[in-house]
From Swiss-Prot:
GO cellular-component term (any): cytoplasm
PANTHER family: ADENINE PHOSPHORIBOSYLTRANSFERASE
Enzyme Commission identifier(s): 2.4.2.7
Disulfide bonds: none
GO molecular function, one term: adenine binding
Protein's UniProt name: Adenine phosphoribosyltransferase
Enzymatic reactions: AMP + diphosphate = 5-phospho-alpha-D-ribose 1-diphosphate + adenine
Encoding gene per record: apt
Subunit organization: Homodimer.
Compartment(s): Cytoplasm
Family per record: Belongs to the purine/pyrimidine phosphoribosyltransferase family.
One GO-annotated biological process of the protein: AMP salvage
Domain of life of the organism encoding this protein: Bacteria
Length: 172
């Protein structure tokens, strides 16, 4: 998948100074390229037989919704504070460049549902780790993590449950 790196734009000092942002929008605007990237993930995730894919706000929603649609399974959204209606469960966590909070609707899934967590990028693992803990706190059975891009030098995998499936397609 390294040949797809040419479609990923790098933006220095965004969203904060010292961060090199990986912009996947050029991939999303090219249907054939996006399909080439998504097809292996679709196949891998289907072997795990999840009940739901949980996408992390906001860039995780894009591909998570496409995967859920293709796999004919439900989509669960994990959002930033005050974006979901009704009762929510939340958790605070540290980012590569600060602190944040994630929330999930309290009764969005059946107890012990198999959940595959998806985000566009794995950096430090803080966001994905917090989202995984949130799924467990909400009664879900987290079965793995999937990402389009991984920044390997930040060792984000070390902050994820090592007993679970972790898949990334493009590594930097």
């Amino acid at each position: 998948m390294d040949h797809l790196k040419k479609y990923i734009t790098e933006i220095n000092d965004y969203p904060k100074k010292g961060i090199v942002f990986k912009d996947l929008n050029p991939i999303y605007k090219e249907p054939k390229i996006w399909k080439e990237l998504m097809f292996p993930l679709q196949n891998l995730i289907s072997t795990k037989k999840p009940d739901y894919i949980a996408g992390i706000e906001s860039r995780g929603f894009i591909s998570a919704s496409a995967l859920a649609f293709k796999l004919e399974i439900g989509l669960i959204t994990i959002r930033k504070p005050n974006k979901l209606p009704g009762e929510v469960i939340g958790t605070n966590y540290k980012l590569e460049y600060g602190e944040d909070r994630l929330e999930i609707q309290q009764n969005i899934m059946e107890k012990d549902s198999k959940i595959m967590l998806f985000d566009d990028l794995l950096a430090t693992g803080g966001t994905a780790g917090a989202a995984g803990n949130l799924i467990k706190k909400a009664g879900g059975n987290l079965i793995g993590y999937a990402f389009l891009v991984e920044l390997t030098e930040l060792k984000g995998r070390e902050n994820l449950d090592s007993n679970l499936f972790v898949e990334t397609l493009i590594k930097y």
